[in-house]
Amino acid sequence: MLKKVYYFLIFLFIVACSSSDDGKSEAKTVSLIVDGAFDDKGFNESSSKAIRKLKADLNINIIEKASTGNSYLGDIANLEDGNSNLIWGIGFRLSDILFQRASENVSVNYAIIEGVYDEIQIPKNLLNISFRSEEVAFLAGYFASKASKTGKIGFVGGVRGKVLESFMYGYEAGAKYANSNIKVVSQYVGTFGDFGLGRSTASNMYRDGVDIIFAAAGLSGIGVIEAAKELGPDHYIIGVDQDQSYLAPNNVIVSAVKKVDSLMYSLTKKYLETGVLDGGKTMFLGLKEDGLGLVLNENLKSNYSEIYNKSLKIGQSIMNGIIKVPYDKVSYDNFVLQMEN
């Protein structure tokens, strides 16, 4: 009898251990790879906040990796080997490698923010999220043009490409829409990771009479903000990707935000609950879909609330289709031509 009890207890122990192991194996793993650094005070930082909130709320495993061009393939392979169920990529520079990995590795799901896939069929296990960045950039340009005291505003971009061009042309179009005589100085620094270069580029612009700069350049853009802080009053910034007013409360007037964190959170949560990724396509988000927004710095509200409210009305015209915002050189040239006629 004792022998039977002994074997029964062993059986229960084995079953309990197996159940415990099964519970652990059921925990999903969501990974995040970004181009550059996580502490960019913008796009990458927002994505990190989203995935960490998912971990806290849903008790999942997460893996975060900051990467650069030559390391993309190896870093993504490591995420795949880490039993990732879903791998998020942040930034257009990851477009090609994520397309390749999704095509070759159908057992893993992938999603990318701002992938560039023109007229290409995306694999079913890859979801691309693309923002109509030109729309919020148009509002930023309109605001800057109305707020400028010198009649000269600037744009500093990181690496030139389709996404950054939509920012630049949208910004320039909005500025011209507000004031056809405004002068817009646009410059790319060629990197998202050079604080010093962003700082010196902005300093030169300010010295040349620019009083408001819209910076879409990652860590290089933080250098632009630093230049405005150092130069003091009358040197202003339009923030990007998230509300950046906390970085320079006296200089960042408004921010052109992309709601990356809330979007990533909701899409990932849905995937984890259903086990289904609605991939094989690009999801386009703009002002109408509440994927973008212009946020006013509360510290400067008394000085700029009127211009801000006018900018929001322009946003309504964009959402209603009254204003067609340009996103590249051809559409921008046509936009300017129509304004002149």
Curated annotation (Swiss-Prot):
SUPFAM superfamilies in alphabetical order: Periplasmic binding protein-like I
Lipidation (S-diacylglycerol cysteine): C17
Pfam families in UniProt: Bmp (PF02608)
Protein's UniProt keywords contain Transferase: no
InterPro entries: BMP_lipoprotein (IPR050957), Peripla_BP_I (IPR028082), PnrA-like (IPR003760)
Binding site for adenosine: D35, E114, F192, G218, D241, K258
Localization per Swiss-Prot or TrEMBL: Cell inner membrane
Main location: membrane
UniProt KW keywords: Cell inner membrane, Cell membrane, Lipoprotein, Membrane, Palmitate, Signal, Transport
Lipid positions (N-palmitoyl cysteine): C17
PROSITE patterns per record: PROKAR_LIPOPROTEIN
Keyword Ribosomal protein: no
Signal peptide: 1-16
A GO-annotated cellular component: plasma membrane
Membrane topology: Lipid-anchor
Role noted for this protein: Binds adenosine and inosine but not guanosine, xanthosine or ribose. May be part of an ABC-type nucleoside uptake system involved in the purine salvage pathway. Other probable members of the ABC transporter system are substrate binding proteins BmpB, BmpA and BmpC (BB_0382, BB_0383 and BB_0384 respectively), ATP transporter RbsA and 2 permeases (BB_0677, BB_0678 and BB_0679 respectively).
Any further remark recorded for this protein: Human sera from 3 Lyme borreliosis patients are positive for this antigen, as were mice injected with this protein. However, BmpD immunization does not confer protection against B.burgdorferi infection in female C3H/HeN mice.
Oligomer and partners: Monomer.
Annotated family: Belongs to the BMP lipoprotein family.
Name of this chain's protein: Basic membrane protein D
Upper taxonomic lineage: Bacteria, Pseudomonadati, Spirochaetota, Spirochaetia, Spirochaetales
